[in-house]
């Protein structure tokens, strides 16, 4: 059948139901939707082949029977020559087969009358039909032009016997090429049996064309191989040709020759069987051998594939069987291996690690109630949960480990001295002054270095870290000591923690008249967490009410036991203002350093340290205060600190003087960064600017991802409804004089406790004055600009006034926190509480066509007020609420309100009222938020 055929047409042709055809197509790997769908010609051919052996036609069963025998002989394809003789023994089941060889001779002589024999052959077919069933019907259906394609007789084939070959419709005519080959090679020897001559009769085989399909029934001739001498048997074996011709084009032809001869001479059924045996070379249509009709589009013939799956499909199916189902989506299944992910990683990063599709992970989380995108940063808990569902152990790499791996990728290391013991030299101790606000930390440092830094601090509160190196004369020896001053206000927790990590010894300043305060305890915790020795300075001993003994007792509770109490912590009573016992304090610091610390470093390596503070200077650009911990920093070095990099163009000490190099434990201001580094960032020297830039860029990307994962509020499906409601949001842009202050301010603001109705969002932060860029961003996002110790630059103020952008300036951090907290609370939706006005009982009801039911009431308590909110009670049960007193009259006059004890008439926005009902009126009063 040329062209496409519909499933129901094929079903009708094959005598089966459409469902069976659809099922068979499914087994063959073809996707067909319904009985009205069309299938390609090659698919239809394979379908007919698969149903051929099952057809009820008598002819086909015969073919099947004959096929059964050939199957075995086909294996010894090399023996086609001798075949003529053995057919009889080989086919014990079919006695007629032996006779076939004898009759082979006459067969060749009758090539011309092939047309006539078909009829008798058909009649002969029925007898053999019963035997066919026992044989394998499946191979039978495989037609193949190969067998009958003997060499010389090729031309004859052109006159095909349409009706002879029941399977001819499945044999493409293009088999001619192989036919010639058959005779060419093995064909020569095979003709020996004498069948070679008549073999040309095989020509009819080729005649088989797609259009011959209908003639299948006529295929009966197979059994009647006798009637058709030469070609008769051949066509009968037509279905078998698969093996003979295609399986071994050359030899196959010869084999078929012999078989043909043998079959031809024999009786109808026997001949067919014999013929098959004679040309089993084709393998009796075995799939292994490419015998039988050629497939469409040049595909080899052979048994139908029956929808066999490819190895790849089987492998995929097996893997899918092992895959867990999370949220209705199939995902890879791990073996408990550990997956390392950076903090703030996205689902795409996770998918790359486990070789999965990011869309599947997104769908899985969506079905589990989490709405995230493939590129959105995901928090650690979500990644661990998703990994656990797939049998993976997700390990979120800490920032320290991630940074270490980053440096290792550039063959760099941080935190260790290079060289041996001989390369280490003494370095000065680094001392951090810590304590509660206003306890005298900066005054103590001023007294030590004879400076007046305290007067420059707003409100007398230290706003950022200062690092200084002073030289102390102890017992005739000059000992340099580096001091780091930290702020004591509660908002500067992170800055105190950095100071503790960068120090060797901590001086804890406690006011003798104030005692241990919250920030005092916090400073103790920071120092103990960093394993830093503590020297306690009890300050303000000259003030009234000072009680140093009380301080010692309080600090004992926190593990700081004085030496006089049998502990190992040195306590020194001082007065920073009067300069009392300052020398004793410094001596205690040096003794502690010498006794418990190994203060050595290698000055010959490339410099490493920590950025204590950083700010943006109008004339000098980004300026970072760095503390060198090991190595020597020189002008011209390529440096990287956090996500900032650059080349050292200038270094300045605490006195404002330029220095060419800085040794370990020396604090200096470095100028030359391309951006402002963060306070507390690691600082190190690299070989090239290129390496510094690459490290900084990768740190910056990692920082953005981590920040996004921390600040982005995830919305679950359960919260979606409430999230879509209108919420108030206060956007802020923070600008400060240094990075540490900006960081502390941001942490304090984000920590303000307000209702979920209001959100605080810091959309930008930076160091330096307020610029026009900041104003434009604030205008576009309805943000407020907070300037801390900075002012607007150039035309920024004019632009802000024109755009209506609010800029607020602060110099004291807690003032900024208080005002912003008040602003947030002002954005909250007001809270209303109900205040009862009065109660009235309905004594009579008057009906009006204009206004509805009118209630005649007696005011029992309070007042009835027009347009007031009301509710209707019946037997002390609320019948209706959120009502309004539409009109109110006292006798015949309109009234605004009616007091207790008076009668009135009123109408409500509700008509189902009865006598005896009670009307309560009330008003909503806004309640101040606390």
Swiss-Prot record:
| Annotated segments matching region G5 | 575-577
Q: So where does GTP get bound?
A: 435-442, 485-489, 539-542
Bias kind Basic residues: ranges: 305-314
Q: MF terms per GO, please?
A: GTP binding; GTPase activity; translation initiation factor activity
Task: Note down the stretches annotated as region G4.
Answer: 539-542
Cleavable signal peptide:
none
Write out the annotated subcellular location: Cytoplasm
Predominantly, its location class is cytoplasm
Q: Which portions of the chain have biased composition (kind: Low complexity)? A: 61-78, 121-135
Q: Where is this region: G1?
A: 435-442
Pro residues: bias regions: 79-99, 108-120, 136-158, 178-192, 212-242
CC per GO annotation: cytosol
Bias-annotated ranges (Gly residues):
193-205, 244-301
Concerning InterPro entries, the annotation shows: EF-G-like_DII, IF2_II, IF2_N, P-loop_NTPase, Small_GTP-bd, T_Tr_GTP-bd_dom, TF_IF2_bacterial-like, TIF_IF2
Which SUPFAM superfamilies has this protein been placed in? Answer: Initiation factor IF2/eIF5b, domain 3, P-loop containing nucleoside triphosphate hydrolases, Translation proteins
Locate the region Disordered: 31-317
Could you tell me the keywords of this UniProt record? Cytoplasm, GTP-binding, Initiation factor, Nucleotide-binding, Protein biosynthesis
Q: According to the UniProt record, where is the region G2?
A: 460-464
**One Pfam family of this protein, by short name?**
IF-2
Note down the stretches annotated as region G3: 485-488
Q: What does this protein do?
A: One of the essential components for the initiation of protein synthesis. Protects formylmethionyl-tRNA from spontaneous hydrolysis and promotes its binding to the 30S ribosomal subunits. Also involved in the hydrolysis of GTP during the formation of the 70S ribosomal complex.
Describe the family membership recorded for this protein in Swiss-Prot or TrEMBL. Belongs to the TRAFAC class translation factor GTPase superfamily. Classic translation factor GTPase family. IF-2 subfamily.
Protein name (record): Translation initiation factor IF-2
Name the gene behind this protein.
infB
């Amino acid at each position: 059948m040329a062209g496409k055929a519909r499933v129901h047409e094929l079903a009708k042709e094959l005598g089966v139901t459409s469902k069976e055809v659809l099922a068979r197509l499914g087994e063959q790997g073809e996707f067909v939707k319904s009985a009205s769908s069309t299938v390609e010609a090659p698919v239809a051919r394979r379908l007919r082949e698969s149903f051929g052996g099952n057809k009820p036609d008598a002819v086909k069963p015969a073919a099947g029977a004959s096929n059964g025998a050939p199957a075995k002989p086909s294996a010894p394809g090399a023996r086609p020559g001798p075949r003529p003789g053995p057919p009889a023994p080989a086919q014990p089941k079919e006695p007629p087969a032996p006779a076939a060889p004898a009759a082979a001779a006459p067969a060749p002589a009758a090539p011309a009358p092939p047309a006539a024999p078909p009829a008798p052959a058909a009649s002969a077919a029925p007898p053999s039909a019963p035997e066919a069933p026992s044989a394998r019907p499946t191979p039978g259906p495989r037609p193949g032009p190969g067998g009958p394609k003997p060499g010389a007789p090729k031309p004859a084939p052109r006159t095909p016997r349409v009706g002879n070959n029941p399977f001819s419709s499945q044999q493409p005519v293009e088999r001619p090429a192989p036919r010639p080959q058959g005779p060419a090679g093995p064909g020569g020897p095979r003709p020996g049996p004498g069948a070679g001559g008549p073999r040309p009769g095989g020509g009819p085989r080729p005649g088989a064309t797609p259009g011959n399909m209908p003639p299948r029934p006529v295929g009966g001739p197979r059994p009647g191989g006798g009637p058709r001498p030469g070609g008769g048997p051949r066509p009968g074996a037509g279905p078998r040709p698969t093996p003979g011709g295609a399986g071994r084009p050359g030899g196959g032809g010869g084999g078929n020759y012999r078989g043909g001869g043998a079959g031809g001479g024999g009786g109808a059924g026997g001949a067919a069987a014999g013929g098959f045996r004679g040309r089993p070379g084709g393998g009796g249509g075995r799939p292994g051998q490419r015998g039988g009709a050629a497939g469409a589009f040049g595909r080899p013939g052979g048994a139908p594939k029956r929808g066999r799956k490819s190895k790849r499909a089987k492998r995929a199916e097996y893997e899918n069987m092992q895959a867990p189902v999370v949220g209705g989506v199939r995902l890879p299944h791990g073996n408990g291996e550990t997956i390392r992910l950076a903090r703030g990683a996205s689902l795409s990063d996770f998918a790359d690690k486990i070789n999965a599709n990011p869309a599947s992970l997104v769908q899985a989380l969506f079905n589990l109630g989490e709405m995230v995108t493939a590129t959105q940063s995901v928090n650690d808990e979500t990644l661990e949960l998703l990994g656990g569902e797939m049998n993976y152990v997700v390990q979120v790499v800490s920032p320290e480990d991630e940074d270490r791996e980053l440096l290792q990728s550039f063959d760099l290391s941080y935190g260790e001295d290079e060289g041996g013991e001989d390369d280490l030299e003494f370095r000065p101790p680094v001392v951090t002054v810590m304590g509660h606000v206003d306890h005298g930390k900066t005054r103590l440092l001023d007294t030590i270095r004879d400076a007046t830094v305290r007067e420059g601090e707003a409100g007398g509160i230290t706003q950022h870290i200062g690092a200084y190196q002073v030289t102390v004369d102890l017992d005739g020896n000059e000992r340099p000591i580096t001091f780091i001053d930290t702020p004591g206000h509660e908002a500067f927790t992170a800055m105190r923690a950095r100071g503790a990590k960068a120090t060797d010894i901590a001086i804890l300043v406690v006011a003798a008249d104030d005692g241990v305060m919250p920030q005092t305890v916090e400073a103790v915790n920071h120092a103990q967490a960093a394993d830093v020795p503590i020297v306690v300075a009890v300050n303000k001993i000259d003030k009234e009410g000072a009680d140093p003994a009380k301080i010692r007792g309080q600090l004992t509770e926190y593990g700081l036991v004085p030496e006089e109490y049998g502990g190992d912590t040195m306590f020194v009573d001082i007065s920073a203002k009067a300069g009392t016992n300052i020398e004793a304090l410094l001596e205690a610091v040096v003794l502690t350093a010498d006794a418990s610390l190994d203060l050595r470093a290698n000055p010959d390596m490339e410099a490493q340290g920590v950025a204590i503070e950083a700010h943006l200077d109008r004339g000098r650009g980004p300026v970072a205060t760095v503390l060198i911990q090991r190595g020597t920093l020189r002008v011209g070095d390529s440096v990287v600190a956090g996500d900032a990099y650059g080349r050292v163009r200038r270094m300045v000490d605490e006195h404002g003087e330029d220095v060419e190099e800085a040794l370990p434990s020396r604090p200096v201001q470095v100028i030359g960064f391309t951006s402002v580094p963060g306070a507390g960032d690691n600082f190190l020297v690299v070989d090239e600017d290129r390496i510094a830039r690459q490290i900084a860029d990768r740190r910056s990307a990692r920082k953005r991802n981590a920040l996004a994962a921390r600040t982005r509020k995830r919305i679950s499906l359960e919260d979606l409804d409430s999230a879509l409601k209108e919420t108030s949001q206060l956007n802020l842009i923070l600008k400060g004089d240094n990075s540490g202050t900006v960081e502390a301010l941001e942490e304090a603001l984000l920590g303000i406790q307000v209702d979920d109705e209001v959100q605080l969002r810091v959309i930008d932060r930076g160091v330096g004055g307020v610029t026009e860029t900041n104003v434009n961003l604030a205008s576009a996002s309805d943000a407020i600009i907070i300037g801390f110790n900075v002012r607007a630059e150039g035309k920024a103020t004019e632009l802000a006034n024109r755009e209506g952008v609010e800029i607020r300036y602060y110099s004291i951090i807690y003032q900024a926190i208080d005002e912003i907290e008040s602003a947030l609370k002002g954005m909250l939706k007001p809270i209303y509480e109900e205040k009862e006005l009065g109660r009235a009982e309905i004594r009579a009801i008057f009906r009006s066509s204009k206004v509805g039911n009118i209630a005649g009431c007696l005011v029992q308590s309070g007042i009835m007020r027009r347009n007031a909110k009301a509710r209707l009670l019946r037997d002390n049960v609320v019948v209706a609420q959120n009502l309004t007193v539409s009109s109110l009259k006292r006798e015949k006059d309109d009234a605004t309100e009616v007091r207790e004890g008076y009668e009135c008439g009123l109408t409500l926005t509700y008509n189902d009222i009865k006598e005896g009902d009670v009307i309560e009126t009330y008003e909503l009063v806004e309640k101040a938020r606390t």
